[in-house]
Amino acid sequence: MGSMSALSLPLSAYLSDPRLAPIAAKVERGERLSFEDGLLLYQTPDLPGVGAMAHFVRTRLHGRRTYFVASRRLSYTNICYTHCQFCAFQAKPGDPRAYVLSAEDILRELHKPESRGVVELHMVAGHHPQLRIEYFEDLFRKVKAAFPAIHLKVFTMVEIGYYAKVSGLSVEAFLDRCVAAGLESCPGGGAEIFDEEVRA
């Protein structure tokens, strides 16, 4: 499969999981997939086959055009008390690697040449024991004042739950204040924190 070219063979030739053949036939005919089809696409180990189908649809819809978002990712702090076992990022308060970025630090980053053309600022970080809603309101307002066109995409769901709690706010009140200050979306990681059944 060429990087930007149409597939040269029928989709079935790119599949290693025979269960995907009926889905590939639907894709080739331009038919809508069912929930069950989606579940199988999620469960199959045949990632190249799924990728071939996705490439087929993308090429049919958009030809050789590819779209992307110029995003800058920053972490406003690496200080975190959570100690997740998968995280090599965190630092404890007092650790020489520990940092908290001020709004001014973030503005300096956005003024650097590597941020030229950025349309989205993506920020996620740890659970800093002393940050509260006021820090985020100040940060969002200053970024939006200096870069009104940049989309602010901030917080995993776990961060929202944590910072709402330590700020003495409901999740809804915390988000209302963040949105009023400039927050526009969240990446969505950790949403299971809000559902007891999923967390269990």
Task: Enumerate the language-model features and the residues they cover.
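Flexible, acidic/Gly-rich N-terminal and inter-domain linker regions that tether
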Residues: 1-73, 77, 81
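Amphipathic, non-transmembrane alpha-helical secondary structure
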Residues: 21, 39, 103-111, 115, ...
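Structural signal for hydrophobic packing residues in well-ordered secondary-structure cores
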Residues: 27, 31, 58-62, 88, ...
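N-terminal pre-triad scaffold of radical SAM enzymes
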Residues: 49-93, 98-124, 186
